[in-house]
């Protein structure tokens, strides 16, 4: 008997209008989650990535999703909830709804508030989405009738009036285990639409600022392999060599804090000189503005004078 593949929708929804359509970034976040999930369950899943509400809903009418995962931020809450209502109207409870992202708080009392506020959501994923979401997909594939019988790692849900919470894995996923969504072509459709590229070389922030959502994160600062980072820069540059006006964004919490950062900056500058892209790099510098952070700016040279 041939089993049907699990249809998974991953959504990083954004308000798209005439003011924002030229400021859209590729959905790197769900790209990583999708790439990691594909790596583990390649022959058992079909994964679709979405940034546009209308594109997602159009696809949902022709392909019934089994799981829809949303990148949840407070600013896109209404968009997410609108799509959840539309999905429920189409397929009732025959679709699993998952919320994950930086606005999912790690405090237990906040968990209760989220469960009360969003009763249509089946599961909330904490921390790094790859671990919690893939653990959930493994449960759906292995025991589809008993998905919520036991806790799920890095996640919490509501069952019989109680909060059921899995083990906290924190920000500890070895980044060598995470495939590149760029190099696997998963983000090509967004690059083709001139979405701004977003590149991540490291994860975690060592600072505990009260005003920042990352201040409560627990884990280890880790770096992606330098070879992968350089290959991604090359890949993105080839896509955008004829579009030098598109801003290159670094998804670094503190660019200039890690010892590899000056090398990345130097590689960006050389790529700009040889390929013609990028001509504008946007990033957040190390908050302490150390010598290494200054070295990063020196290494970039005149790249931002385009």
Tell me the role of every PLM-derived stretch.
Residues 3-4, 152, 157-198:
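N-terminal [4Fe-4S]-dependent radical SAM core
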Residues 4-11, 67, 94, 98, ...:
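Conserved SAM/AdoMet-binding glycine-rich loop
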Residues 17-30:
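Glycine- and acidic-residue-enriched helix-capping/strand-helix junction motifs
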Residues 17-19, 173, 207-208, 218-220, ...:
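Flexible loop/turn segments at secondary-structure boundaries
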Residues 34, 60, 81-85, 137, ...:
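Generic structural signal for well-ordered alpha-helices
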Residues 36-168:
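Glycine-rich beta-alpha loop elements in corrinoid/cobalamin-binding modules
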Residues 128, 224, 259:
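Residue-level signal for the nucleotide or nucleotide-sugar donor/cofactor binding architecture
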Residues 190-227:
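Canonical Radical SAM [4Fe-4S] cluster-binding loop centered on the CxxxCxxC motif
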